[in-house]
Amino acid sequence: MLNKLNLPIHIIGGGLAGSEASWQIAQLGIPVILHEMRPQRLSEAHKTDKLAELVCSNSFRSDDSLTNAVGLLHAEMRLAKSLIMKAADANKVPAGSALAVDRDGFSQTVTESLENHPLITIKREEIHDIPENWHNVIIATGPLTSPALAYAIQAVTGTEALSFFDAIAPIIYTDSINMNICWYQSRYDKIGPGGTGKDYINCPLDKEQYEAFIQALKDGEKIEFREFENVPYFDGCLPIEVMAERGVETLRHGPMKPMGLTNTHTPKVKAYAIVQLRQDNMLGTLYNMVGFQTKLKYSEQVRIFRTIPGLEKAEFARLGGLHRNTYLDSPTILDETLRLKKKPQLRFAGQITGCEGYVESSAIGLLAGRFAAAEYNNTYPSLPPKTTAFGALLNHITSGYIVTQETEKHSFQPMNINFGLFPPIDSTNHQRKTMQYKEKKLAKRQAIVERALNDCTQWLNGLK
């Protein structure tokens, strides 16, 4: 009986997943030791020693729980008393219908919450291997797992981790943006958490400027990665220049789409493309370039991005960069409670399991924490229904194979939460014959959301 021995649960990695897992376990009255290698050892992307540091965007994406899958996941996490969502809500900044946060305030809130919890001990040390006398362990080291621990994980799992490139976008000082050219507006004037409908700074481009910009992206000098040349990108975080290579019009229909925006300086002139900047901190002194993750050389970033109208004199607080992410072939090696089949005392959580995104990583950390707590109390974990966002995401990780028709081989890819992961629903009761396609699609999503929230509430109530 592990609980009678009063042994703590060990969590390796103080990112989003590890922080959330620690909180969930401690809130259930179980001691936790959280191991974090920073500041003893920094990764190639981290800049601070704070827990739950956001290394890429400051956005948790849409907070619309009625029609958006990630917004639904937000809602379920709030129901489960998530620390990550509590910290995000406390540090939100204007971002239209999205939930974006002051990244420093957010990580500070998480760090202080964990440091002040009487059942959580934080050890600042790098873990090179997993001690045999640790009987209940969650590995939440994320996509930037240190080489030594990655090797230890590979040795235990008996399989090579898969990898892909991930990139981060530049951040600009607000006072260096030319507001005689740019203007404040959220797409379609949407008002979200902490927002006003004027939460983004917009930079307009005409057709000639846009095409010149695309060519500059293609021609710009990129950082070369000899060691990782054959590692693919994750489609949800493609470098801007890679998107430009896919076609001249790609960016106009992606992060630079002009729809739903009107230039307040010249309202009768429709922009051909628009670059959006999103507030990055509560003070409003920093804005990040939405969708502009890049592997361009630093000097090229400054030169090319200053050709964007309104950014001619832009000063950069941080330039974009690129790092390697790793994830496991989870459906092969993990069971339904995220335990390693070969070594059940080990459980994995977060992005290393093959989920993609801040919220998804935190959600899997939440589940892993609750599963580990149940095991500590000698009960089999109660799985979230597959009809919930929690359950849909967990099911993808533990059984989300894609069979390729060409080779008939099983393939597992990182995935954001989306409605395609949910079981089908009979939405005829929510639809009328007179509805158009978009209306029927909306009604179906709302039916999925209603079912998910009801099932999630019942599941959580059953855990009490």
From Swiss-Prot:
The family this protein is said to belong to: Belongs to the MnmG family. TrmFO subfamily.
Name of protein: Methylenetetrahydrofolate--tRNA-(uracil-5-)-methyltransferase TrmFO
One Gene Ontology term, aspect cellular component: cytosol
Catalytic activity: uridine(54) in tRNA + (6R)-5,10-methylene-5,6,7,8-tetrahydrofolate + NADH + H(+) = 5-methyluridine(54) in tRNA + (6S)-5,6,7,8-tetrahydrofolate + NAD(+); uridine(54) in tRNA + (6R)-5,10-methylene-5,6,7,8-tetrahydrofolate + NADPH + H(+) = 5-methyluridine(54) in tRNA + (6S)-5,6,7,8-tetrahydrofolate + NADP(+)
Gene Ontology biological process: tRNA methylation; tRNA wobble uridine modification
Gene name per UniProt: trmFO
Binding site for FAD: 13-18
E.C. no: 2.1.1.74
Main location: cytoplasm
InterPro entries: FAD/NAD-bd_sf, MnmG-rel, MnmG-rel_CS, MnmG_N, TrmFO
Cytoplasm listed as a keyword: yes
Listed SUPFAM superfamilies: FAD/NAD(P)-binding domain (SSF51905)
Cofactor field: FAD
Function summary: Catalyzes the folate-dependent formation of 5-methyl-uridine at position 54 (M-5-U54) in all tRNAs.
Keyword presence, Methyltransferase: yes
Single annotated GO MF: tRNA (uracil(54)-C5)-methyltransferase activity, 5,10-methylenetetrahydrofolate-dependent
Pfam families: GIDA
Record keywords, A-Z: Cytoplasm, FAD, Flavoprotein, Methyltransferase, NAD, NADP, Transferase, tRNA processing
Cellular location(s): Cytoplasm
Positions of disulphide bridges: none
